[in-house]
Amino acid sequence: QMCIRDRLSGGQQQRTALARILAGRPRILMLDEPFSALDSYLREAVESEVGSLLAGFDGTALLVTHNRDEAYRLCPEMMVLDSGRVLRSGHTRDVFADPRSITAARLTGCKNILPCTRLDAHTVHLTGWDVPLQLALPVPEGCTAVGIRAHDFVPCDAGAPNALPVAALSSSENPFDWNLICTAPDGTARLWWKVSKSTLSSPAPVPPHFLCAAPESIMPLTN
């Protein structure tokens, strides 16, 4: 169908641009924030099409994005950059599971960066809670913090491994989950807990007295 460019929707413009690029049979394809100008519905539709395109592309594709979810869904390999420096690279799932540095953890969306001191190869002392945490990953000598993703916390009893006593500070509601900010008992440290409404369906969620994270979910981080 023939259309004047100005009459194309955002999604149609993106599809047209991709078609023009692919017509030249490139060996390298660079996509710089390809979905940033689209609304959420179009973004998901176009992203799905681009994912199918990349799966069949016989060449090298480079996606530049600030959206961690796009990178996770579309890229088998990723590189985390900050001010022109490579902070972490490797298989995408490995980078998310073990970002290694505080900056890389933040760029992959980790909300809980908790200061700590190293005790041994798999144990840290968590500042603010005055408790030890057990980690599955090796703790490097220069470890100054641990990263715990907000959805990796679960309610637990006082004696559970890696149990952290918490008190409620604030909460906010999303369509399908809750964001809760909790503090250490003395209020000197805080953490984010993201929990689905299927777990906490109350209109005014109250966090438990203790939250914990599995050793496999705790990431040792350096500066």
What are these regions (language model features)?
Residues 111, 122-223:
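Non-catalytic connector elements of ABC transporters
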Residues 1, 5-103:
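ABC ATPase nucleotide-binding domains
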